[in-house]
Amino acid sequence: MTRGPVDVLIRLLDPDVPIPSYGHPGDAGADLVTTEAAELAPGERAVLPTGVSIALPDGYAAFVHPRSGLAARCGVALVNAPGTVDAGYRGEIKVIVVNLDPRESVRFERFDRIAQLVVQQVEKVRFHEVAELPGSARAEGGFGSTGGHASVDGAEGGITHGGNSYASVVSDREGQ
């Protein structure tokens, strides 16, 4: 069963900013742009304005996700990905970007696409304190305990934490 689109009220804080839109049919994220030009040196971060604020219906939240092309081509990431926009928030949506490229600066021009906004229905939960949780196949395994990465699977000289062994990816990359 396909639901229709969710109606979201939007306020344009910059009269020239485009309303967030989807690049292709079926896309999950609507593109957000920056309203200010900025240049980030390697390792530098900035909070970029999008020129929009929204009012989500109760039971929904929006999540600010990175754009894969910026990550792949420029080394740009979002510091708090995904950023959460709660239904009651009415301020401007801003995006915290960081330039992870070790050598090159990255420049953003006004109205460059910098992130994607994904709107999702969210559930409210009630937490019930218990002395013990029921068992599961996974138990307390986390942080790579299911494998699937060469640096974690059978890593020699790795770090052991809670019975799990981890490779020091940072040390490996820095040649230490």
UniProtKB/Swiss-Prot annotation:
Q: What is its EC number?
A: 3.6.1.23
Pathway in which this enzyme or protein is active? Pyrimidine metabolism; dUMP biosynthesis; dUMP from dCTP (dUTP route): step 2/2
The record's keywords, sorted A to Z, are: Hydrolase, Magnesium, Metal-binding, Nucleotide metabolism
The record's section on Pfam families has: dUTPase
Q: Which domain of life is it from?
A: Bacteria
Protein name listed in UniProt: Deoxyuridine 5'-triphosphate nucleotidohydrolase
**Keyword match Transcription:** no
Which residues are connected by disulfide bridges in this protein?
Answer: none
NCBIfam families, from UniProt? dut, PRK00601.1
**What function is annotated for this protein?**
This enzyme is involved in nucleotide metabolism: it produces dUMP, the immediate precursor of thymidine nucleotides and it decreases the intracellular concentration of dUTP so that uracil cannot be incorporated into DNA.
Mind telling me which InterPro entries this protein's record contains? dUTPase (IPR008181), dUTPase-like (IPR029054), dUTPase-like_sf (IPR036157), dUTPase_trimeric (IPR033704)
What species does this protein belong to? Streptomyces griseus subsp. griseus (strain JCM 4626 / CBS 651.72 / NBRC 13350 / KCC S-0626 / ISP 5235)
Question: Which biological process annotations from GO are given for this protein?
Answer: dUMP biosynthetic process; dUTP catabolic process
In the record, the note on similarity to other proteins reads:
Belongs to the dUTPase family.
The coenzyme or cofactor needed here is:
Mg(2+)
Q: What are the boundaries of the region Disordered? A: 141-176
Q: Which reaction does it catalyse?
A: dUTP + H2O = dUMP + diphosphate + H(+)
Q: Which GO terms describe its molecular function?
A: dUTP diphosphatase activity; magnesium ion binding
Any idea which positions bind substrate?
A: 67-69, 80, 84-86, 94
